[in-house]
């Protein structure tokens, strides 16, 4: 993982991109002791090259590390958290908070030097294993999510199997009258 981080950081550096261009990382396994694994992650982080540390952001996952876990780590090492909605649905935390309140906690991990807060958005493919991404967006589900976050300033990355076509679909869902490329993703 460290070699991969070094490689990808070098690419961003060679492209002369500032530190708002980020490297997204899951924490990893728990190896029988989650708190020990968290402490190892924090220890290793402190020994990374400074340019990697400036670009690194951590994400909640759907197996081991809840949003609460990654926010704890974030607080210890002062790096941003990227929220993944599907992972949060599968492995939830903060049961008393709604989506907006949860994202306010995530937003606190982002500093001006990090750029705009980023989130991952995906939907469950109901015909596949838990955590598998959907091929297309379900319009109602997507609109409900967007309604709940409408007052937040952030970038949303879509994790949908149709990739760029899903971005066109999202524009069509959000702006049906203004968006003229609707047939591109439908064909």
Sequence positions of predicted segments:
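Active-site glycine- and acidic-residue-rich loops that bind
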Residues: 1-3, 58-68, 89-103, 165
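Active-site acidic/histidine proton-transfer and metal-coordination neighborhood
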Residues: 1-76, 80
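Active-site-proximal loop/turn and secondary-structure-junction residues that shape catalytic pockets
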Residues: 27-31, 60-64, 85-89, 123-125, ...
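Conserved, mostly hydrophobic/aromatic
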Residues: 56, 84, 156
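Long, repeat-rich segments with strong aromatic
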Residues: 72-74, 81-93
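Histidine-acidic metal/acid-base catalytic patches
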Residues: 79, 91-187
